[in-house]
């Protein structure tokens, strides 16, 4: 059982355990020791988003890593997939991302990439934790002339821009397209506008003035209403919203209607099926994806495999099965032919390429999938008990499942990063499933304590 690492690294409120400078230094020390194999000089890339606490945590990590004889390459604010890409392209031993993704600025996190750009497997996270809590690290310190050095890589953002543009078809450009782009005042505030503008689009950029405390604040992928209003105001062709570390993306079409991760997976999967480029005719999604996605892909001659929630589990399944497209309803999209992790900007480029190639507007492309009505209720809880051990809750869920049968489904799971129980229902009648979701939430509140969120 891991004590620090969750589904997406170590995460919490900045300056509160475990996101303290003391723990960040220990994480840096332990990771550096584990990645330090052989006698050659070793290097770890560190990047971050735009949170105020990023400076504090970065300095602690740098100190910890250097104290164990490993050099640090600091790339500054850069999207999470950019850090994965730079780690691999610079042949570093590992990459570290300081970010809490879509969470508010008060939170922060630390997650690692291996030298190949893929996220750290569970067993390596466990090794880092074991070393931290073993108390053995003081005896592992190198002597003074063997400590590491820290360097700044000033052209990291430019390198990533060049890489992203290389994933767009060379015989196409974006001239004639007007795009509203929301960078969430986060890590992509410089990179994303540059990519789309250099490919010829007219870009109306918002969320590009980070101040340390406004990341994800009323903007970004969790607030599609912002780009929806801007698309209507400017008569744009579409809107693109990234989150704080730009590993996910949400769209709105020319009418301001949201096009979520399921829609995007359906668009890309069916296009790749038509071209014969979808490996094994298979898309990898999570259990949160709408049943309408399964129907759309099956109709096009493919299939959908479902994993647990979390882009790391999607990537693991893709690697294991040799698949090249996967993603989540939340907007994480993984194109393994191009990158090793969820990449909002790269995903947007692939969708734009489909639009240009097929000569269709986004609203037309989105018609490939019709989503079943879906309701999601979050309940904030004090403890993460197995709700199926509560007779009243288990009984109610069983009754609802019997009524839904094959025309819908119930999914109940705890968030991997927050103290939330997520209750999701799909079915033919939205009003009916909304009532059922509320019934389950009320029973959970009564038996575990807590309150509904959103």
Swiss-Prot record:
Under SUPFAM superfamilies, the record lists:
Phosphoglucomutase, C-terminal domain (SSF55957), Phosphoglucomutase, first 3 domains (SSF53738)
List Phosphoserine occurrences by residue: 101
Give the residues the record marks as binding Mg(2+): 101, 243, 245, 247
Can you name one GO molecular function term for this protein? magnesium ion binding
UniProt cross-references to Pfam families, sorted A to Z: PGM_PMM_I, PGM_PMM_II, PGM_PMM_III, PGM_PMM_IV
Q: Name one GO biological process term.
A: UDP-N-acetylglucosamine biosynthetic process
User: Which coenzymes or cofactors are required?
Assistant: Mg(2+)
Q: Which UniProt keywords apply?
A: Isomerase, Magnesium, Metal-binding, Phosphoprotein
Please give the GO cellular component terms listed in this UniProt entry: cytosol
Q: What InterPro entries does the annotation carry? A: A-D-PHexomutase_a/b/a-I (IPR005844), A-D-PHexomutase_a/b/a-I/II/III (IPR016055), A-D-PHexomutase_a/b/a-II (IPR005845), A-D-PHexomutase_a/b/a-III (IPR005846), A-D-PHexomutase_C (IPR005843), A-D-PHexomutase_C_sf (IPR036900), A-D-PHexomutase_CS (IPR016066), Alpha-D-phosphohexomutase_SF (IPR005841)
Catalytic activity line of the entry? alpha-D-glucosamine 1-phosphate = D-glucosamine 6-phosphate
Coiled coil segments of this chain:
none
**How is the polypeptide modified once translated?**
Activated by phosphorylation.
Cofactor comment in the record? Answer: Binds 1 Mg(2+) ion per subunit.
List the HAMAP family hit by this protein, alphabetically. Answer: GlmM_B
Q: What does this protein do?
A: Catalyzes the conversion of glucosamine-6-phosphate to glucosamine-1-phosphate.
Which family does the similarity line name?
Belongs to the phosphohexose mutase family.
What protein does this entry describe? Phosphoglucosamine mutase
Task: Give the source species.
Answer: Geotalea daltonii (strain DSM 22248 / JCM 15807 / FRC-32) (Geobacter daltonii)
């Amino acid at each position: 059982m891991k004590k620090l690492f969750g589904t997406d690294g170590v995460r919490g409120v900045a300056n509160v355990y475990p996101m303290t400078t003391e723990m960040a230094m220990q994480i840096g020390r332990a990771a550096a020791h584990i990645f330090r194999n052989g006698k050659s000089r070793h290097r770890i890339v560190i990047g971050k988003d735009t949170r105020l606490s990023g400076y504090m945590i970065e300095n602690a990590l740098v100190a910890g890593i250097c104290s164990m004889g490993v050099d640090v390459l600091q790339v500054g604010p850069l999207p999470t997939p950019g850090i994965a890409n730079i780690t691999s392209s610079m042949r570093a031993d590992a990459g570290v991302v300081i970010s809490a993704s879509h969470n508010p600025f008060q939170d922060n996190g630390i997650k690692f990439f291996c030298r190949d750009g893929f996220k750290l497997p569970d067993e390596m996270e466990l090794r880092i934790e074991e070393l931290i809590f073993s108390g053995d690290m003081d005896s592992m310190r190198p002597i003074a002339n063997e400590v590491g050095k820290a360097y700044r890589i000033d052209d990291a953002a430019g390198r990533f821009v060049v890489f992203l543009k290389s994933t767009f078809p060379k015989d196409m450009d974006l001239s004639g397209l007007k795009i509203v782009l929301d960078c969430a005042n986060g890590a992509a505030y410089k990179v994303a506008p540059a990519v789309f503008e250099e490919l010829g689009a007219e870009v109306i950029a918002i969320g590009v003035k980070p101040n340390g405390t406004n990341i994800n604040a009323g903007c970004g992928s969790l607030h599609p209403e912002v780009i929806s209003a801007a698309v209507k105001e400017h008569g744009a062709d579409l809107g693109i919203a990234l989150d704080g570390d730009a590993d996910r993306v949400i769209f709105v079409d020319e009418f301001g209607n949201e096009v979520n991760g399921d829609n995007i997976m359906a668009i890309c999967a069916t296009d790749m099926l038509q071209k014969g480029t979808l490996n094994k005719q298979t898309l990898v999604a999570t259990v949160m994806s709408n049943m309408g996605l399964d129907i759309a892909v099956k109709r096009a001659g493919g299939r959908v495999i479902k994993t647990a929630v979390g882009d790391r589990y999607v990537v693991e399944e893709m690697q294991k099965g040799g698949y090249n497209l996967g993603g989540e309803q939340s907007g994480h999209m993984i194109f393994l032919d191009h990158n090793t992790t969820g990449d909002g900007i790269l995903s947007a480029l692939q969708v734009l390429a489909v639009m240009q190639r097929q000569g269709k507007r986004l609203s037309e492309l989105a018609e490939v999938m019709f989503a079943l009505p879906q309701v999601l209720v979050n309940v904030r809880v004090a403890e993460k008990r197995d709700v199926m051990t509560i007779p009243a809750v288990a009984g109610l869920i069983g009754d609802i499942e019997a009524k839904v049968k094959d025309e819908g489904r119930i999914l109940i799971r705890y968030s991997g990063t927050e103290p939330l129980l997520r209750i999701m229902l799909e079915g033919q009648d939205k009003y009916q499933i909304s009532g059922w979701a509320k019934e389950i939430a009320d029973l959970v509140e009564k038996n575990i304590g807590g309150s509904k969120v959103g």
